[in-house]
Every structure is written in structure tokens, then in C-alpha cells.
């Protein structure tokens, strides 16, 4: 047994399929199962991906039997020749497959309306002797819960995410809850930050990073930094109490830089603040090409506050629709504070909103000058007693999509700060 794993309650995830190994399909099953295991408080130390190869699959199954109490597999339960999971599991422990007549009837019933049914479909009714069946209400491939040797159980689920999730919720998860009653409750809370880098955040929490319970894990996405606080205790309420003082300390250190907790998004926060104040917003975009509008419209409740916007990508639209004087564009360039200001004031007038945001920039890979490099973005926010110009240089090394995303995050976050300060 591997020395770094406590086999008492450890769970391992194995996702099967060459399409996963080659990167053709995102391995969303592993992510979802890992979150589920954390939620029910079972330790999960290892994930693997293996292609549709029986020898490699066999080796990983045997290795898992020596180091983990439970192996959860997804994929390889279908009717095609490369679906090898069940027969390889049986082979690993020298157990014969037997035909399950109930499963066979279920497969025939589900395939009755199909014009062509292959004999391969019926191999899904061949299961290891003694295995508990996990019914599949949506597909033809049943799952199994099987304990082939002492202290080792295999839970096999389909690779189709919808089928896998349903079978986990209805059968696999309840089985784990019953068979691992002594597990501790694991609770996590995520704090989200904008306007600071991951390195800055880490430098200012060095004294907290060594905490064992709760643990603090920083990780970054484009324009945002997150801190996940995770505590383990006998009960969920005890775990939450362990997190509270750390959360208070972090909010004390970073203040308004923390914009949300858990699954809340920046656009949800902004829309909530606008809605609370009964205020509206309109947008004038150039380099972001409607991405800021998409951030609003992709959020429930946006119709209450977001009236509309214009993508003024061409200078003629800036001039003829938004009312930006052509002389101003010629003098300062489309990517400039004066032009961004006129764009914001123009859209404010057109839609008669309380707030407006304008964005103009150079997202690349062309269009830069000596004084205006790729990554230069001008943002202007207009609102009640607010006329604020923001210039950002996101870096010429960034991809076009990254500059667009960073511009959207920066604009939303600055609007959030204005709204909070006026509350």
C-alpha cells in the first residue's frame, strides 16, 4: 500500500476513455465527483485517466485495490468493442461475468423502438457475480457497486454526465453515506477578489497559509483571484465555525477588494446593487465587441437594470450614432480618454440611463503604436456625480480574448466600487 494514502476511507477516481486522454472531451465528470466527495467528507487523494486499453486499465485497477478503499470509475460501460470496463474489472479479480436477465429485459425494452439493435447492446447485461446493480433510468448501461476483495469496493458509472450524476445521487452516494458513517464533515467557502494579483494576495496572507484546519488555497482565473477556505469537523456547523474567524480576518485585510463569496459572479453583484438602487445602465463598446453586454445579459435579473448597448467598433458609428466629434477622434485617436468619455455620455443620452460604461482599446494582434501598445484600454464610467476615466495596460503579450475579458472585469469592478461607495 502506498505510504502517502490512508486507506481507511480514501476514495480514488478513474475516468476511462481515449477521448479524455487525447483532450477531445473535457473531463467534467472528475471535477463533479471530486466536489461531491468533498461535500460528503470523504478523502479523495488521486485521480487517473486511462484510454480504452484493457492492459493499462487492468494495471490501474489493481494498483487502486492496494491503496484505496473505493475506486469510482466513469466510462467504458457502453455496447461497443472499446467499452472494456466491466470485463476488465472482472478479469482483475478472476471473476466470471454472468447474464442478468432483469438488465437484459430492461435493455430490450429501451431499445424496442430502435430500427437496428446490435447484439453488442446485450453485453451490457453481463455483470460480475455478486455485484450490486446501479439502475440507469436514462440509458442502457447499468452501473455496479462491487466489493471483489476485503476493504476494496468498485463503483462503476457511465461516462455520460447526465446518467452518471443521476446514478450517483440515487444509488452511489447513499451507499457511501451508509458504509462510511464515521467520516468528518468537510465545508468550504470561496472568497473572490478583483483588482489585486494572486502574488499580492499570497504575500499578504503568508501567516495564514500554514493553517491546517481550515486550510487556505489561493487560485487565480483571468481578472479574479479566489481563496478557498476548507475546514473539517464532526459536523457542518462546527466546520463553519472554524472558517468564520479566518474569513473575518481576510475581509479586514482586503476590504472591498473581496467582491463575492462562493458562486456569486461579479456581474451578479453589480446587477444586484443597481437593482437595489432602482438604477439603470447602458453600454458603448468597441474593443470588447459586446462582451460587457454579454456579462450583463448572461445574468438573471439583468433586464431590470440593463437597457441596452451599442458596439461602436467602427469610427463612423462612434461619430454618427454616439455623437463623438470626428475632430476629437482625429486629434486623440479612437483609443483615448476624451473619446471614451464622449462614447459614455453619448450612450447615456441615447438610452436615458442612470449609468453608462464605454470601453475602447487595442486588443491586438495589430493596431498598436509606439504610444498605444497592444493591451491599452480606455474605460469611462458616467453616472450620478461620477465621471471617471480609467486607463489600463494589460500587456502586449496577452491574447485578444484575454484583453477583452480583463477589460470587462475591470469595468464591472470599478462600477461595483462606485455603487458601494454611494450606498
UniProtKB/Swiss-Prot annotation:
Superkingdom, natural source: Bacteria
InterPro entries assigned to the protein according to its UniProt record, in alphabetical order: CinA, CinA-like_C, CinA_C, CinA_KH, Competence-induced_CinA, MoaB/Mog-like_dom_sf, MoaB/Mog_dom
One Pfam family hit: CinA
Coiled coil feature spans: none
Assigned protein family: Belongs to the CinA family.
Cross-referenced NCBIfam families: cinA_nterm, PncC_domain, PRK00549.1
HAMAP family: CinA_B
Name the record gives this protein: CinA-like protein
Organism: Prochlorococcus marinus (strain SARG / CCMP1375 / SS120)
Gene encoding the protein: cinA
